[in-house]
A protein has these predicted regions:
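Sec-dependent bacterial lipoprotein signal peptides
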Residues: 1-14
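Residues within mature, well-folded domains
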Residues: 17-164
Length: 164
């Protein structure tokens, strides 16, 4: 598992080094984003220049499980909602989540902006569709951008990933 993650990270770096000018094809639009584990791994790799140990990964998963359990106890309506499996089992960010749910799974964003020019640059060819509802953008590791209207996640884009 560690070798696979390291291989993926190295291939991403090689891909970045060999690419020329970014094109619209480099941006994808999605209804589902990364998992909490993927965000954790990206943050850890960026912060420590290595992959987490088994113990560090286990500690993260235990803490995440506790946060999710606490959230569900405070918000029982989520347990019976259609997005319950995304939140409780897959731990994957998906359109329709609230800011609190996104933060619970993905942590705090690297950047928060309401600047339309920055959002347009990130969304590229998808901006005409996204701008209708997107009022705020959160930027996360792995070049993920989450677009919000008020408290709800309304769109997701990712830069530089193979087709989802």
């Amino acid at each position: 598992m560690r070798r696979l993650a390291m291989l993926i990270a190295l291939m991403s770096l090689v891909g970045c080094a060999t690419s020329t000018q970014p094109s619209d094809k480099d941006v994808q639009r999605a209804t589902e984003g990364p998992t909490a584990d993927e965000i954790f791994m990206s943050r850890f790799l960026r912060g420590y220049a290595r992959l987490p140990t088994f113990d560090e990964s286990t500690a993260f998963r235990i803490e995440l499980e506790q946060r999710v359990s606490d959230y569900l106890a405070k918000h029982p309506e989520v347990s019976t909602s259609p997005r319950a499996s995304q939140f409780t089992f897959h731990r994957r960010i998906s359109v329709g989540m609230t800011k609190e749910e996104v933060t619970l799974l993905a942590g705090t964003p690297y950047e928060v902006t309401t600047d339309e020019a920055k959002m347009q640059a990130a969304a590229r060819q998808f901006w005409p569709s996204i701008k209708v509802r997107a009022k705020e953008m959160w930027v996360y590791p792995g070049d993920w951008q989450f677009y919000f209207q008020d408290d709800q996640l309304v769109d997701i884009t990712v830069f530089g990933k193979p087709p989802l």
